[in-house]
């Protein structure tokens, strides 16, 4: 397909999904420096919250270095052209969090649910739209639902007021044909004025290819992260995606070389570990496991002596989804007992 002249809005994930590999401990200075770099590179939309969205600070998901309010309050006043978004997962984030984000200047709210549970988003999507915000319905772990099921869920979110729907490959499981089938079906069912987005993970090295497949299927918003900083093997690496788009004539408005510099000079130096496709993150994609489970599985592996890869395969077999982080340790403990391993002292 000739995509020459196609316009795409690139949405940065470095400061939200990138909080997962940073264990949500990014400093305000790091956040501000990277956000300003992204802004100067021409990235139009930047997401800023705890990795699990507004209100994510908890025993279950991890305590951040600063509150969402502090992160948003530090970044938003510095932006010259970029707008700032916030993720909200019903059951974690509340309407009060949404109102706080709006008051601080957030212009886009992305309401995320598991791909078969769009009905729990009604309150938050309706409120966001009533406040005049750019309102996105975000269907996570989309590989677990058929194209037909995704269509029904997307239509619910559109009906609640979402002006954009995202099909989200949270596990980095999908291949380009999977992406085309799902986004193509959703695009055909939505109103022409409702936008369509894609969020990928690079666990099978498909982030860029899947994002291009999404554009071919009608998506006009694409998530990516500088240096791929995100859960698992990271999100679609933005600097690579932007270069590919430039080669194909897809218009993003992002400077090819400036975004490379942000990735190389600002993001890579703050990584606690190099974001790459190792055996555990590859297993996430292969087994269809939620990408942010990676560090939880690695910690459980150290504690119980069960290889992280084995834990991840079992989580995939059980069909675990986002929000069941507390079950990872339980799974590892059960596997250790079944293998006759001595459990570490509490």
Curated annotation (Swiss-Prot):
The enzyme's E.C. designation: 4.1.3.39
Pfam families assigned to the protein according to its UniProt record, in alphabetical order: DmpG_comm, HMGL-like
Residues in Pyruvate carboxyltransferase domain copies: 8-260
Annotated Mn(2+) binding sites: 17, 199, 201
SUPFAM superfamilies registered for this protein in UniProt: Aldolase, post-HMGL domain-like
MF GO annotations: 2-isopropylmalate synthase activity; 4-hydroxy-2-oxovalerate aldolase activity; manganese ion binding
InterPro entries reported for this sequence: 2-IPM_HCS-like (IPR050073), 4OH_2_O-val_aldolase (IPR017629), Aldolase_TIM (IPR013785), DmpG_comm (IPR012425), DRE_TIM_HOA (IPR035685), PYR_CT (IPR000891)
Biological process per Gene Ontology, one example term: catabolic process
UniProt binding sites for substrate: 16-17, 170, 199, 290
Active site, renumbered: 20 (proton acceptor)
Annotated positions for site Transition state stabilizer: 16
EC category name: lyase
Keywords: Aromatic hydrocarbons catabolism, Lyase, Manganese, Metal-binding, Plasmid
Catalytic activity: (S)-4-hydroxy-2-oxopentanoate = acetaldehyde + pyruvate
Keyword Manganese attributed: yes
NCBIfam families given in the database record: 4OH_2_O_val_ald, PRK08195.1
Family: Belongs to the 4-hydroxy-2-oxovalerate aldolase family.
Name of the protein described by the UniProt record: 4-hydroxy-2-oxovalerate aldolase
UniProt source species: Polaromonas naphthalenivorans (strain CJ2)
């Amino acid at each position: 397909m000739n995509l020459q002249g196609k316009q795409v809005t690139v949405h940065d994930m470095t400061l939200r999904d990138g909080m997962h590999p940073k264990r949500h401990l990014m400093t305000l200075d790091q956040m501000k420096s990277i956000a300003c770099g992204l802004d100067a590179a021409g990235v139009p939309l930047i997401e800023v919250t705890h990795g699990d969205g507004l209100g994510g600070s908890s025993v279950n998901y991890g305590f951040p270095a600063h509150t969402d309010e502090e992160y948003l309050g530090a970044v938003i006043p510095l932006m010259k052209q970029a707008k700032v978004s916030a993720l909200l997962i019903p059951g974690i984030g509340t309407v009060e969090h949404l109102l706080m984000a709006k008051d601080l200047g957030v212009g886009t709210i992305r309401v995320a649910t598991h791909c078969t549970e769009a009905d729990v988003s009604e309150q938050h999507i309706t409120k966001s739209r009533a406040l005049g915000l750019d309102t996105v319905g975000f269907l996570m772990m989309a590989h677990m639902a058929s194209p037909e099921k995704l269509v029904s869920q997307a239509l619910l979110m559109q009906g609640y007021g979402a002006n954009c729907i995202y099909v989200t490959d949270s596990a980095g499981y999908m291949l380009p044909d999977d992406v085309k089938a799902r986004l193509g079906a959703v695009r055909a069912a939505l109103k022409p004025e409702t936008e369509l987005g894609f969020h990928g993970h690079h666990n099978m090295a498909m982030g860029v290819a899947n994002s291009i497949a999404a554009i071919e299927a009608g998506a006009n918003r694409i998530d990516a992260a500088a240096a791929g900083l995100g859960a698992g093997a990271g999100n679609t690496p933005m600097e690579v995606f932007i270069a590919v788009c430039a080669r194909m004539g897809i218009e993003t408005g992002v400077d090819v070389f400036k975004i490379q510099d942000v990735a190389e000079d600002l993001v890579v130096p703050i990584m606690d570990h190099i974001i790459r496709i190792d055996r555990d993150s590859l297993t996430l994609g292969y087994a269809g496991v939620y990408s942010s489970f990676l560090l939880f599985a690695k910690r459980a592996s150290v504690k119980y002596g069960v290889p992280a890869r084995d834990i991840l395969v079992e989580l995939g077999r059980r069909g675990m989804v986002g929000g069941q982080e507390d079950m990872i340790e339980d799974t590892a403990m059960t596997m250790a007992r079944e293998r006759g391993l001595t459990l570490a002292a509490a």
